[in-house]
Amino acid sequence: MSMLISTSSFAFTMTAILIGGTPGTGKTKVAKVLGSKLHVEVISLGELAKENGCVSARDIARDTGIIDEDCLVDAIIPLVEDKSKRLVIEGHYIDLVPSRSVERAFILRTHPDVLRERLTTRGYKAEKIQENVEAEVLGVCQMDAIDAFREEKVFEIDTSKTSPPDVAELIEKMMQEPPAPIRIDWMEMLEREGQLDDYLTD
């Protein structure tokens, strides 16, 4: 049974709950459900970048926008410095959020095989699928978050077989009673199974 967290029950100076992860791990859907459960605004960093003119160019080869990170930081700061409201912030650039404003950072992880299927269904190009699968195997989003915030603020959740509502409910519980951070290591698992080379390019 889900427990509702009232935004008035927290005396906090940190205003942001972050949801990050490789494309395809479920960030946007989980953030929307969590925002609804907590009755707080959800900020998509991708949309924020577009709205503030922070997409400086387009990388045609990688089929993605190039983000002006300084511009995006300037757009983020006024949002998180408003201590009167709590936010859920999701996206691929959560490490740009000032650490002092972060309550918790949740990194969504997905088994590389499941991630490949999801990105294929989305119509991603083969090169972009491989790039994102490699990033997931290597734990790039995990490492970026740990580098940006204190390790005890960073939690990982396996979304391979878990629906967005269930992930949001788990995050809600972890906000109330934070467990010891769990680290998901696809590299170790794949290496143990003798499959790591199948997922990484030279």
Describe each PLM feature range.
Residues 14-16:
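Pre-Walker A (Motif I) flank of P-loop NTPase domains
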Residues 30:
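Hydrophobic positions on the alpha1 helix immediately C-terminal to the Walker A/P-loop
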